[in-house]
Amino acid sequence: MKTSGLLTILLVTLGAVLCADRPDKPHVLFMLIDDLGWQDVVCYDLDEPCPYETPNMDKLSRKGVMFLNGYSPSPVCSPSRGAILSGKHPARTMNTTVASGKPPAPFHRRGNSFIAPWCRGGMDPKEYTITQALKDNGYTTGHVGKWHVAINHHAFPQPVDQGFDFSTHYPKNQMARGVQSGMKNRLANFATKNPKDPYRLDENGYPYDHVTGEALKFLEKSKGSPFFLYYASWLVHSPLQSRSQVLLEKYCKKLGVDYPTDPEGWTLEGQRNPYYCAMVETLDYYIGQMLTLLETTEDPRWPGHKLIENTYIIFTSDNGGMEGHHLEVFTDN
């Protein structure tokens, strides 16, 4: 009789825990990808078959809301990022270009042909960002990856000056760019399985990315409170490179192109750059790592449920794709 009573109490208690209300403040994971084009994701491909493999991005589109008419506030990086964080048009933040005030370079075919209009050297530290608003409402706020809301990556204010409790963006931290830290020769120095290799290949053959690694740590560490994570990947911005030689070889074969022997440039038009293909797939893999953590981790604020069940995930690009420059074709929008 005593055993039965104890069992009843346990069942009632467990039922009460499992039926606990969803927390009022959901978690937020905001993924802002660098220079990803709208046709660089399979789910948005409209004409010829997209060669890139993006199963995790496509999974988000199937399980969420897919927008077809979204427009960036600016065609370049810094103004668009400042606008997204502040909710204001670049003209209002007075940050309208990547670098302002540079004089023309005479007799230089790649130099500026005019002086860009004046703009602020960085976001106004008094600007009330979405991060500060969430922090004021009890959120733990984190940033990993790229910042660039000014004329360069080192200008004031930095993420911690705009409402972030945590940021990996340290100007002198060589690992701050993660897997996108420049390779001196993109046909050499590929990642290995050596434990001492900072880009060591994991069990699935993908290189370690410091940015994503720090994101995963933040998600795990902050799960006990409502969190806002601004995941600002350096992918798929130039330099075009793949630390996985296997991925580079895979896309050369898939595209029917010869494995490159010259590390400089790529002239084939369209979506036929194997370096870029490898970068897009690598990015997708990192997104999958974060989704897996959310899907498999118990939400301490909502017992019996996973983090993914009470997390808003927003996935977008800062300013759309870059088709290339005078030396190299990246992709085709």
Could you tell me what each predicted segment is?
Residues R22-V65:
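Active-site-proximal N-terminal segment of extracellular/periplasmic enzymes that hydrolyze or transfer
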Residues D24-L29, K63-L68, K135-G142, Q162-D165, ...:
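Loop/turn elements at helix/coil->beta-strand transitions in domains of secreted/extracellular proteins
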Residues L10-C19:
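Hydrophobic h-region of N-terminal signal peptides that target proteins for export
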Residues Q39-L46, S72, P79-G82, M94-V98, ...:
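Short, solvent-exposed loop/turn and secondary-structure capping segments
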Residues M94-T140, W147-S242, P260-C277:
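Formylglycine-dependent
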Residues Y52, A155-G163, P239-S242, L293-N333:
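Histidine-centered active-site microenvironments of extracellular/periplasmic hydrolases
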Residues E48-R81, G87-R92, T140-G142, Q162-P171:
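Short, structured active-site-proximal loop/turn typified by the sulfatase FGly-forming signature C/S-X-P-X-R
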Residues T212-L219, L255-T311:
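A long, amphipathic alpha-helix that forms part
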